[in-house]
From Swiss-Prot:
InterPro entries: Thymidate_synth/dCMP_Mease, Thymidate_synth/dCMP_Mease_dom, Thymidate_synth/dCMP_Mease_sf, Thymidylate_synthase, Thymidylate_synthase_AS. The active site is at C179. The lineage of its organism: Bacteria, Pseudomonadati, Pseudomonadota, Alphaproteobacteria, Rhodobacterales. (6R)-5,10-methylene-5,6,7,8-tetrahydrofolate binds at D203, A297. Homodimer. The gene is thyA. It is found in: Cytoplasm. One of its GO terms (biological process) is dTMP biosynthetic process. Pathway: Pyrimidine metabolism; dTTP biosynthesis. GO terms for molecular function: thymidylate synthase activity. It holds the Pfam family Thymidylat_synt. This is Thymidylate synthase. Its EC number is 2.1.1.45. It comes from Cereibacter sphaeroides (strain ATCC 17023 / DSM 158 / JCM 6121 / CCUG 31486 / LMG 2827 / NBRC 12203 / NCIMB 8253 / ATH 2.4.1.) (Rhodobacter sphaeroides). Catalyzes the reductive methylation of 2'-deoxyuridine-5'-monophosphate (dUMP) to 2'-deoxythymidine-5'-monophosphate (dTMP) while utilizing 5,10-methylenetetrahydrofolate (mTHF) as the methyl donor and reductant in the reaction, yielding dihydrofolate (DHF) as a by-product. This enzymatic reaction provides an intracellular de novo source of dTMP, an essential precursor for DNA biosynthesis. Belongs to the thymidylate synthase family. Bacterial-type ThyA subfamily.
Length: 298
């Protein structure tokens, strides 16, 4: 039986071989395929933390926990030593202020100066805002995550168990429109929680590995809150691409053999979806190949 990570490696190889060369928003350029699907079985405790390169899984889980707070400012992320969202506010600050500040100096200023953080660390109404405080036309805020968990508990056969972040009225105010847009859930007759994540845009080398981990961690938390066990995680990509400055790294990764996937488990049952902390997650048996460095396209 093929290693489940081989699906991802095959997608890298297909993109390298058949990807359509395109000029993109960032100016870097991409090789792009449209429409991809991967399926991972989480029922045995294994999770899709790639082994053909080191994935910093704690960073991905911390990001997911930040989404669940409804946060839209990078300061709490920086306080957790998570820097994956700094590029966009940094670019905005440089553009508007004219100051050629380093990323490290910018992040330090965000950490030390609350007023500066409030002005320049803000990302706009990104994921967490839409997940937890979607503003309706009547002024009422909708908590999509709470509604999802309540439906899982009370009507698990529903086909309406999803949440998304593509708020048309607010997309233009976001530092980056949502890439991982829609999360849909499905409960089997024997109590397994399946999840489907749709991404409209996929940075295959850097973004997708983090999205796999975040979605799996979220599935574990939601399953626990609803009294279910994790099942399949289905990942669907729209514009699935490799940036042209990531091609050598992708070739290197496809030449590596996958190792046994690690297991992720929750160390306690949190009182609610809002009460999980990074210390609640344990990953066991993770033995990856070395990390592969690559630049983020902004």
């Amino acid at each position: 039986m093929a290693h489940p990570e081989q699906q991802y490696l095959d997608l890298l190889a297909q993109t390298l071989e058949r990807g359509d060369r395109r000029v993109d928003r960032t100016g870097v350029g991409t090789l792009s395929l449209f429409g991809a699907m991967l399926r991972f079985d989480l029922s045995g405790g294994q999770v899709p933390i790639l082994t053909t390169k080191r994935v910093y899984w704690k960073t991905a889980v911390k990001e997911m926990l930040w989404f669940l707070t409804g946060g839209t400012n990078i300061r709490p992320l920086l306080q957790e030593n998570v820097r994956i969202w700094s590029d966009w506010p940094l670019a905005a600050y440089r553009r508007e202020s004219g100051e050629e500040i380093s990323q490290a100096a910018f992040e330090q200023r965000v950490l030390e100066d609350e007023a500066f953080a409030a002005r320049w660390g803000e990302l706009g109404p990104v994921y967490g805002k839409q997940w937890r405080r979607w503003l309706g036309p009547d002024g009422h805020e909708h908590d999509q995550i709470a509604a999802l968990i309540e439906t899982l508990r009370t009507n698990p056969s529903s086909r309406r168990m999803l949440f998304h972040a593509w708020n048309v009225a607010e997309v233009g105010q976001m530092a980056l429109p949502p890439c991982h847009m829609v999360y849909q859930y499905h409960v089997t007759s024997d109590g397994r929680l399946n999840a489907l994540l749709y991404q409209r845009s996929v940075d295959l080398l850097l973004g997708a590995p983090f999205n796999f981990v975040g979605a799996a961690a979220l599935q574990l938390m939601i399953a626990q809150q609803a009294g279910l066990v994790p099942g399949d995680l289905v990942w669907v990509g729209g514009d699935t691409h490799l940036y042209l400055n990531h091609l050598d790294q992708a070739r290197e990764q496809t030449g590596r053999a996958p190792r046994d996937w690690p297991r992720m488990r929750l160390l306690r049952r949190a009182d609610s979806i809002d009460d999980y902390r990074i210390e609640d997650f344990a990953v066991e048996g993770y033995d990856p190949h070395p990390a592969i460095a690559a630049e983020v396209a902004v």
